[in-house]
Amino acid sequence: MKLLLLASLLSAAAALPIPLGQSGGSSSEQRFNLYPPQILPFFPQFPLPQAPLIPIPFPFPFDPNQVLTPNQLLALITSILNQLQGFLGR
C-alpha cells in the first residue's frame, strides 16, 4: 500500500513540470504557471445553423392518451417518414 502511495505521489510530481534556468529572481507566478496561455482559435467560430422546425401533419386526430393500434402506428410512422423524405430531397 505504501509503495502504491509513493508511486502515485512520484507520478503526480513528475506530471507538473517546473521551468528551470530562469534569469533573475523568479516569482511563484513564474514557477507555478498552471494556466496555459490563451490562444485564439485558428478557424473562426461560426454559430451552427438551427434546424428548421417542420410541422408534421398527423394523418388522423391524435390524442396522446389514446392507445395506438398497429395500423395507426404504421400510418403515423409512414406519414412522418414521407414528410422527412420531402424535406431531405430524396
UniProtKB/Swiss-Prot annotation:
Q: Does the keyword 4Fe-4S apply?
A: no
Where does the UniProt annotation locate this protein? Secreted
Q: In the UniProt record, does the keyword Transmembrane helix occur?
A: no
Keywords associated with the record: Secreted, Signal
Q: Which residues form the signal peptide?
A: 1-15
Q: What is its main location?
A: secreted
> What are the annotated GO cellular component locations?
extracellular region
Q: What is the protein's given name?
A: Secretory calcium-binding phosphoprotein proline-glutamine-rich protein 1
